[in-house]
């Protein structure tokens, strides 16, 4: 059960990094791009978060500005820090920055603490954890600052009986019921990505094996108990 991991004493981050495999998406997109250039395929449909439908918002120091879940209370720190971008005068070299700032939006999260929109690989479509695109440094490593481009995650409770009362996210048991239910949802996610041309058929084999690997871990054997 990969999401139930501890952080080593020498680790910089306060939380474990996100285990969210996405390399197959790049191969599928490059394959489509190559075919489009050759005139044998059309571009894939766009899929990105939008302000209009609430899947993007302007973040603040309040973690609930992006999510209804109070992740810091559950153990996943949040600083509200994100990259900013100034309006620059590009008519000269070097360019001259101004004090005007672009509005930066971030994806909003669903009831499980994951991005509502965008292309979802199996780890995101059939999640075992809340995945964050940031990572906060722990004590001894400039505590509270962002840890570069690192990610983080906070696992769901495996069984409902073991849930933290403050955790509003569904447990793995509530989401999938049994190991077979999890694998069925996982494989359906893989098949949909292949049908949408967001995963190559060759990669689908490896990703279905990844689902088996997840479900074969020791703690997963207690799912539904």
Question: Where on the chain are the PLM-derived regions?
Answer:
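C-terminal His-loop and adjacent cap/lid subdomain of alpha/beta-hydrolase
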Residues: 1-225
